[in-house]
Regions:
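Junction motif at the cytosolic side of a transmembrane helix
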Residues: 2-8, 229-235, 245-270
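Aromatic- and glycine-rich beta-strand/loop motifs that create alpha-glucan
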Residues: 2-46
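Short helix-capping/hinge motifs at transmembrane helix termini and TM-loop junctions
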Residues: 54-63, 138-146, 175-177, 199-204, ...
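Residues that define the loop-to-transmembrane-helix transition and helix capping
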Residues: 37-38, 70-71, 113, 179, ...
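Alpha-helical transmembrane segments and their short interhelical loops
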Residues: 112-192, 236-249, 253-260
């Protein structure tokens, strides 16, 4: 009598299903942006006005040896805008947890890591319209921006978008609800705008502020974008771009690993 071989059960958690789910979550975040005109216009106009008003005021009233402040602030705002947009976007995962959408996504047959990966991908994509708007406005203001610089900036922007989203994932994984995130995030981001050198040179900071500046993740995102923009050794660039890429990559992996672990654990305990 021949043995009956039972068919191998198919896994509900196949790689294809997980990738499709992550893509759907990312597409949902992009669609939400397109359907929210206030958020879309604010995200596009505010950085441009920041460069035009703040950059113009700084360039007219302050001098820094060897640094043209308008391109300096342009590169800083480009980095800060993408990094902050990607990081802040992760707050939406707390919103999803609290509304009806959570009943659909958090009980779906997909891994919690897939949910987080989809949110990170989606918010990274959402950050790019702002980046291209800043570039276009920079050209309008007469800031030099060549095709070679754009080619160098795009991969750097991709990296810092993922870097920012990973930072946001780590912070969000430690918070219980959206209200806590809305209260905490301004205290995390606002000091970094100045300590990271997004708007001002930071080579001559007092020693205690210099220590805090080196702890700020945004510092390395800003410096990487300036390295890609200037393309050659420049007084505006603090560290070698290769060093910044290496450090950002390591920090991204560490923050993403810890954030994912904490997020999965918190969801299991709910």
């Amino acid at each position: 009598m021949s043995a009956v071989i039972a068919p191998r059960p198919t896994s509900r958690f196949s790689l294809r299903n997980e990738l499709a789910a992550a893509g759907a979550i990312a597409a949902r975040d992009v669609t939400k942006l397109l359907r929210d005109p206030i958020r879309l216009v604010g995200g596009l106009v505010f950085p441009a006005l920041f460069i035009g008003v703040l950059g113009g005021a700084f360039a007219s009233n302050f001098e820094s040896p060897g640094i043209d402040l308008l391109p300096f602030i342009f590169a800083g705002q480009l980095a800060q805008g993408v990094w902050q947009s990607a990081a802040l976007g992760l707050i939406s995962i707390l919103e999803d947890r609290e509304n009806d959408f959570s009943q659909e996504i958090f009980v779906a047959p997909i891994g919690r890591r897939t949910i987080l990966a989809g949110k990170i991908l989606g918010e990274s994509l959402v950050a790019f319209p702002q980046a291209f708007t800043v570039m276009l406005f920079g050209i309008v203001l007469g800031i030099p921006l060549t095709a070679a610089q754009v080619v160098a900036l795009i991969p750097a922007l991709v990296l810092i978008a993922i870097f920012g989203a990973s930072f946001g994932a780590l912070v969000v994984s430690l918070l219980p609800n959206q209200r806590s995130a809305n209260l905490l995030f301004p205290f995390i981001f606002l000091p970094q705008f100045f300590l990271a050198g997004a708007f001002n040179p930071i080579r001559d900071l007092p020693w205690y502020l210099d220590i805090v500046s080196h702890i700020a993740p945004l510092r390395y995102a800003v410096d990487l974008i300036r390295g890609a923009y200037y393309g050659v050794p420049n007084v505006a660039v603090l560290s070698d771009p290769i060093w910044n890429v290496s450090l950002i990559s390591i920090l991204t992996v560490v923050m993403l690993s810890i954030g994912t672990l904490l997020f999965v654990r918190s969801e299991r305990n709910r």
